[in-house]
């Protein structure tokens, strides 16, 4: 077992008091009289009793941790392009700034920040995902520039005003209460600290595209041939967010908007089709995609649409940049 010498960054997720190292597999909150498990140097700082919804989310992503990149085509240029747009805000932070990624999945985004001389805390509610993220980091970076923890996004185990930036990508819609998360972000951020909310789904596909595809799949019995047939409990119940929702979340967290990016128009249809085909019928080494030059042309088209009144409402995703007042 590895000693959890990164514990200085964390507090008890319940009472927010300091933690003490008991041994290589356990840390204790004396205030709560509660021991938290440490797995391979990763503190498991979850609430004492995880609600059923969150437990099922964690179990699902434990199982899917090895398939995450394959399912979401995260190396595609259309994905990387928009990820780089919000990562730019974090790379501009001063050297030594502490960035917390919540719901970080397999660590793809967090690993891209490690060459920017930032301290990156990679977290997820899934132990399997955090372990997967840890494999993307060199031994010299572990517990120095790259810290790993298992935690609940609605009970962040960090001290008040201790974080320079918080990032959550394609995970806000997995939370039972986004408002609670935004309040937690306000608590842990330093004054003027940044929040990056990346790739959150818009509402309209849930009422137009997905019901149509579901019905079509039932008629054609397509799902019987699919490689992946299940979704997480959060994805099954998700309805996305509209612009008004995001503004209400900011208000709940007393945060100020810096930038709202509209992600994908035509690219949303393309990505949905290709990711479905690849995740159902192709292996990791056989996935198909548009040539990069074609993807760049579609991005130019999408950027043009994003400036047209009315049509700009129909982006597939949002990226929100905000700061603490």
Question: Where in the sequence are the language-model features?
Answer:
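A C-terminal cap/extension of S-adenosyl-L-methionine-dependent methyltransferases
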Residues: 4-7, 248, 259-325
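Conserved class I S-adenosyl-L-methionine
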Residues: 8-11, 38-94, 108-112, 129-132, 194-223, ...
């Amino acid at each position: 077992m590895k000693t959890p010498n990164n514990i200085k960054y964390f507090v008890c997720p319940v009472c927010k008091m300091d933690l003490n190292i008991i041994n290589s597999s356990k840390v204790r909150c004396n205030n709560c009289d509660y021991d938290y498990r440490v797995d391979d140097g990763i503190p498991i700082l979850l609430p004492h009793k995880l609600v059923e919804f969150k437990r099922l989310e964690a179990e699902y992503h434990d199982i899917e941790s090895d398939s995450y990149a394959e399912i979401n085509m995260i190396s595609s240029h259309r994905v990387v392009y928009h990820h780089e747009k919000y990562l730019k805000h974090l790379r501009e932070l001063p050297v030594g700034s502490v960035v917390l990624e919540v719901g970080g999945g397999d660590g793809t985004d967090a690993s891209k920040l490690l060459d920017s001389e930032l301290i990156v805390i990679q977290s997820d509610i899934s132990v399997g995902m955090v372990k997967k993220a840890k494999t993307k980091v060199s031994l010299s970076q572990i517990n120095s520039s790259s810290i790993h923890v298992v935690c609940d996004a609605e009970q962040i185990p960090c001290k008040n005003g201790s974080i320079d930036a918080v990032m959550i990508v394609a995970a806000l819609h997995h939370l039972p209460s986004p408002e609670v998360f935004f309040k937690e972000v306000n608590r842990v951020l330093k004054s003027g600290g940044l929040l990056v909310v990346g790739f959150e789904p818009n509402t309209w596909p849930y009422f137009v595209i997905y019901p149509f595809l579901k019905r079509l799949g039932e008629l054609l019995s397509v799902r019987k041939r699919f490689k992946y047939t299940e979704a997480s409990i959060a994805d099954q119940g998700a309805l996305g967010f509209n612009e008004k929702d995001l503004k209400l979340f900011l208000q709940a967290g007393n945060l100020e908007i810096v930038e709202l990016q509209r992600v994908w128009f035509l690219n949303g249809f393309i990505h949905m089709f290709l990711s479905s085909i690849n995740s159902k019928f192709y292996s990791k080494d056989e996935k198909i995609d548009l040539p990069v030059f074609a993807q760049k042309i579609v991005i130019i088209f999408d950027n043009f649409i994003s400036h047209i009144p009315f049509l700009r409402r129909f982006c597939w995703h949002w990226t929100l940049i905000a700061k603490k007042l």
